């Protein structure tokens, strides 16, 4: 297995060390002090398996497309239709930059976005009715992954995607709430192609900011 990416971090060095990864191409390192010392101490071994390129090359959409990269990016949250927020907590506090994730998500042979299904000891669901900030649209997201499962969204209608994301990716404690939201959206939304209840779609985020929990009090 080889890696064509933007930044090499500790996990990739461990994969190289184990032999599971044979080579890695990137534009920079972002290593912990401990891992940096380890790499410097064994540079003769790594220099044959790591190449650093200009960002114009490492993030070049045409090269990413021609290589057939399987693009795997982390996310903060995804909504039931496949829109992804990878940079902003609660829609306004930036956690990290966008980086090259857009180049890889849009141009990779397969675009995978992943996160745990919940955060903050279960008080936050990473699968929500509507994301509070959009970095990757539903048109670029092909596969969503959490520890609960995998949702292959390719070729599906919005309502098919929503049902699959809830079934495969949502945390068990949030799944009934998402199913209820979708059912009521299908019944009461303005139009039914991509059902939403606009008075509720960002309500989970508002509830967390008020109470410290996305779940209603009687559910938590």
Task: Describe the residue ranges of each PLM region.
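Conserved phosphate- and dinucleotide-binding cores of soluble alpha/beta proteins
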Residues: 1-220
């Amino acid at each position: 297995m080889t890696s064509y990416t933007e930044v090499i971090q500790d996990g990739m060095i461990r994969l190289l060390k184990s032999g599971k990864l044979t080579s890695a191409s990137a534009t920079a390192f972002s290593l912990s002090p401990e891992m940096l010392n380890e790499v410097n101490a064994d540079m003769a071994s790594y220099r044959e398996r790591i190449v650093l390129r200009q960002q114009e090359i490492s993030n070049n959409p045409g090269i990413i497309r021609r290589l057939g990269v399987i693009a795997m990016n982390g996310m903060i949250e995804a909504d039931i239709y496949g829109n992804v927020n990878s940079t902003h907590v609660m829609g306004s506090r930036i956690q990290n930059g966008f980086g090259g994730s857009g180049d890889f998500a849009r141009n990779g042979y397969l675009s995978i976005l992943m996160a745990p299904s919940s955060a903050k000891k279960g008080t936050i669901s990473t699968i929500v009715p509507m994301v509070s900030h959009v970095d990757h649209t539903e048109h670029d997201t092909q596969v969503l992954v959490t520890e609960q499962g995998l949702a292959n969204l390719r070729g599906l209608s919005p309502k098919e995607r929503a049902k699959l994301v809830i079934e495969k990716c949502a945390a068990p404690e949030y799944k009934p709430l998402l199913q209820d939201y979708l059912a009521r959206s299908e019944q009461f939304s303005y139009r039914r192609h991509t059902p939403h209840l606009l008075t509720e779609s960002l309500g989970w985020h508002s509830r967390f900011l008020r109470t410290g929990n996305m779940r209603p009090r009687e559910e938590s």
